[in-house]
């Protein structure tokens, strides 16, 4: 008997859809990894009101431009997701932004979560989520 193999790709969280592109956390992770950054923290928020994704990065030491990173990420996501590429080409989905967080931002966010009862060793966040569901205003850390 040859039973079909099923590969589990994604749970319900970590998927965002602003204009029909259905972007997966795994696609974003691959795109971010291609940048070869020394990341301390990364958070990507889907802003449905502005029709764009905003990436927040805390870097260990690099002096890079958020605009340059946004350009490269956009290219990688267009290669990884045909619907993303089509929505970008039609300008239904606006160009993503990369905002660089101040040093120590991750620690402040993590300590706040721990102060609200989350266990320090178990703290983690979903990389890709909707802005309106994220508990912090990351613009305060830019």
Spans of features found by a protein language model:
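AMP-binding adenylation
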Residues: 1-142
